[in-house]
Swiss-Prot record:
<dbReference type="GO" id="GO:0071555">
    <property type="term" value="P:cell wall organization"/>
</dbReference>
<keyword id="KW-0573">Peptidoglycan synthesis</keyword>
<feature type="binding site">
    <location>
        <begin position="186"/>
        <end position="187"/>
    </location>
    <ligand>
        <name>substrate</name>
    </ligand>
</feature>
<feature type="binding site">
    <location>
        <begin position="76"/>
        <end position="77"/>
    </location>
    <ligand>
        <name>substrate</name>
    </ligand>
</feature>
<keyword id="KW-0133">Cell shape</keyword>
<feature type="active site" description="Proton donor/acceptor">
    <location>
        <position position="75"/>
    </location>
</feature>
<comment type="similarity">
    <text>Belongs to the aspartate/glutamate racemases family.</text>
</comment>
<comment type="function">
    <text>Provides the (R)-glutamate required for cell wall biosynthesis.</text>
</comment>
<dbReference type="InterPro" id="IPR018187">
    <property type="entry name" value="Asp/Glu_racemase_AS_1"/>
</dbReference>
<dbReference type="InterPro" id="IPR033134">
    <property type="entry name" value="Asp/Glu_racemase_AS_2"/>
</dbReference>
<keyword id="KW-0961">Cell wall biogenesis/degradation</keyword>
<comment type="pathway">
    <text>Cell wall biogenesis; peptidoglycan biosynthesis.</text>
</comment>
<dbReference type="InterPro" id="IPR004391">
    <property type="entry name" value="Glu_race"/>
</dbReference>
<keyword id="KW-0413">Isomerase</keyword>
<dbReference type="Pfam" id="PF01177">
    <property type="entry name" value="Asp_Glu_race"/>
</dbReference>
<dbReference type="InterPro" id="IPR015942">
    <property type="entry name" value="Asp/Glu/hydantoin_racemase"/>
</dbReference>
<dbReference type="GO" id="GO:0008360">
    <property type="term" value="P:regulation of cell shape"/>
</dbReference>
Length: 271
């Protein structure tokens, strides 16, 4: 039986999942968080589905083995690659980033034309397209935007170069006259201002990070595992499988003062 005092485990291929962690902290400030950024193997977008699945399940095994009460796959590529395996493998609730965003997009659209942008792995997996299949009267246009992650990981979230890239990527969505756009990668909220500028103010942007945090609230409430308000102050642990110093510098853009030190993960612990 899981304890309400146990932490919530969150992982991503790098720093993008910190947008999810930030949203969870905002909505559930009393919860302990353990976050693992797999910067030693990520970004996952260019990898094959079997490679992504292997890396993601190794981190999931580590977090579940450490006693988390819920596991959040804060990565669209990993969600599309290993969600079914994770839910069969673990005895704790597994929350992913795709379905929460799909539900919000269906509720938000006015003309039924919805766009999805993500990594090449996410778009070619058809995870979003399949998730939208149950929604009536929707027309989905999905576009891979692989270089967005590179810019975010470099800390470049504005400027002429990335705006030009965005305009090129998003042109098919404008032609399709989408009125709602799912940011199908947890890195992309850091580009939301630029994406909104390229798409126009009448297009609603749906952040998978915000919707996933709402799903974590719903799941923990449903199974009565919310951390009590009178519990000791929340602790947040951030770990990286790659260079912790580089992770810390970039992660500060996502979390600001909430971010403490980042601990390295020894390769022998996750394999």
């Amino acid at each position: 039986m899981n304890s309400p005092l146990a932490p919530v485990g969150v992982f991503d291929s790098g720093v993008g999942g910190l947008t999810v962690a930030r949203a969870i902290i905002d909505q559930l400030p009393d919860e302990d968080i353990v976050y693992v950024g797999d910067t030693g193997n990520g970004p996952y977008g260019p990898l094959t589905i079997p490679e992504i699945r292997a890396h993601a399940l190794a981190i999931g095994d580590d977090l579940v083995g450490r006693g988390v009460k819920a596991l959040v796959i804060a990565c669209n590529s990993a969600s599309s690659a290993c969600l079914r395996d994770a839910r069969e493998r673990y005895q704790v609730p597994v929350v992913e980033v795709i379905l929460p965003a799909v539900r919000r997009a269906v509720a938000a659209t006015r003309n039924g034309r919805i766009g999805v942008i993500g990594t090449r792995a996410t778009i070619t997996s058809h995870a979003y397209q399949d998730a939208f299949a149950a929604a009536r009267d929707t027309e989905i246009t999905a576009v891979a935007c692989p270089r967005f992650v590179d810019f975010v990981e470099l800390g470049v979230t504005s400027g002429r170069q990335v705006l030009g890239l965005a305009q090129g990527y998003l042109e098919p969505l404008q032609r399709a006259e989408v009125d709602t756009l799912v940011l199908g990668c947890t890195h992309y909220p850091l580009l939301s201002g630029l994406i909104q500028l390229a798409m126009g103010e009448n297009v609603t942007l749906v952040s998978s990070a915000e919707e996933t945090a709402k799903e974590v609230v719903r799941v923990l409430t449903e199974i009565d595992l919310l951390r009590p308000h009178d519990a000791p102050p929340a602790t947040r642990i951030f770990e990286a499988t790659g260079d912790p110093e580089a992770f810390t510098k970039l992660a500060a853009r996502f979390l600001g003062p909430v971010l403490g030190g980042v601990q390295p993960v020894h390769p022998s612990r996750i394999h």
